[in-house]
Amino acid sequence: MFFTKVLNNQVANGLKQLPVHKRVQMAYDLHIPNKTVNPNLNIRSHEPIVFVHGIFGSKKNYRHDCQKIANVTHTPVYTIDLRNHGQSMHALPFDYETLAQDVTDFCEDHGLKKVNLIGYSLGAKICMLTMLQNPDLVRSGVIIDNSPIEQPHIEIFLTQFIKSMLHVLNSTKIRADDKDWKSKANQAMRRYIPNGGIRDYLLANLINKVPKGYKSPVINYDDGYIHFQNPVRHMTEVAVKNVSAWPTEHVKGLKFEGQVRFLKGTKSAFIDEKGLEAIKEYFPNYSLSELNATHFILNERPQEYVKLICDFIKVNRYKSLQEHIRHVENFSSAELEARHNAEHERQMEELRQLTQTTPTAEQVKTIDNLASKVDLSATERQQQQNKEITV
């Protein structure tokens, strides 16, 4: 097993072993639609958005973009920290099967259904694998500049990322109390990464104090030096070989029939002809938009990619509503009324019972869920009467 070899190499290099956990608790932020956008907005959503970052990224990288997406689409957006990133646990394995299962576990733990997945780079592959292996969990996907194939040609770039970060940690020995710690780290990384935008992306993980919340068991935050939030010394192999991989054998014959929008940088090689053929095979209902950018689309074309995502989510929601109404219209008026009346009354009676006394935290969740169902029931009846949709 590859990660067993990784653990042995960590010991050989004098490093404390990275723990092995099948499941991890992932840190996340929830971006709620701003009430000023629509004061009457009911934020309960059966189709929330989950945003998955790239290698050495975190949930904080695109928090402003995700808030815009939440506001424009009137949809809650969950941004997560993958294992070994941000404020989430540091642990092996670090492969696509494990990372996709982490996303699935997160959705199930938080009661998220029919999610819209948005993934960038590493996160894009994780989202694609999640869609293929758990299609009932996902409504749609936005895949930002990646394709479902092995990509050995990107290993040279991943290696440079690792070298630059290790150079900051091992060679420069920058003190945490140095007032110029970040600029010195930036200068040190130039040796391996001339692109200032990429350096800024990696430096967003650099800290000069003990982090709040999760504290890695393999990083000594009290040694007086700066540190990356990622366990960089422990990721020299997995961040290169595993990130460039794709579990072809595990997804053979699988397809995701939902709508998937791919965003491609015209100056990027992450979606080539081979990648496009694989996209067609796995995702028959895909569409492709190109932006004048390198692989770092989110930094170079922030307004364009946010608009493309919002338009896609809104159009897809309209199609979802159309499907729902076509389903409802298959019932006769009498059948529909009987169905609604019985279910509506049962839900209302349960709500009455729960709200007679001060509810517990668990009962609050039940009340919220029931209220959402009652709202939907009323909406269905109105739709049957009006025979029209307002989006």
Swiss-Prot record:
This is Ethanol acetyltransferase 1. Belongs to the AB hydrolase superfamily. The keyword rRNA processing does not apply. GO terms for molecular function: acetyl-CoA hydrolase activity; carboxylic ester hydrolase activity; transferase activity. One of its GO terms (cellular component) is mitochondrion. The active site is at 121 (charge relay system), 145 (charge relay system), 295 (charge relay system). In contrast to S.cerevisiae, W.anomalous is a better ethyl acetate producing yeast. Ethyl acetate is an important industrial compound, used as a chemical solvent applied in the synthesis of biodiesels, paints, adhesives, herbicides and resins. It is also popular because it is relatively non-toxic and fully biodegradable. However, the sustainability of the ethyl acetate industry is severely hampered by the current energy intensive production processes that are based exclusively on petrochemical resources. PANTHER family: PROTEIN ABHD11 (PTHR46118:SF4). It comes from Wickerhamomyces anomalus (strain ATCC 58044 / CBS 1984 / NCYC 433 / NRRL Y-366-8). Its EC number is 2.3.1.268, 3.1.2.1, 3.1.1.-. It catalyses: ethanol + acetyl-CoA = ethyl acetate + CoA; acetyl-CoA + H2O = acetate + CoA + H(+); ethyl acetate + H2O = ethanol + acetate + H(+). It is found in: Mitochondrion. Its main location: mitochondrion. Keywords: Coiled coil, Hydrolase, Mitochondrion, Transferase, Transit peptide. Residues 1-24 form a transit peptide. Alcohol acetyltransferase that catalyzes the synthesis of ethyl acetate from ethanol and acetyl-CoA. Can also function as a thioesterase by hydrolyzing acetyl-CoA in the absence of ethanol, as well as esterase hydrolyzing ethyl acetate. Residues 48-154 form the AB hydrolase-1 domain. By ethanol. Thioesterase and esterase reactions are highly repressed in the presence of high ethanol concentrations. It comes from the Eukaryota.
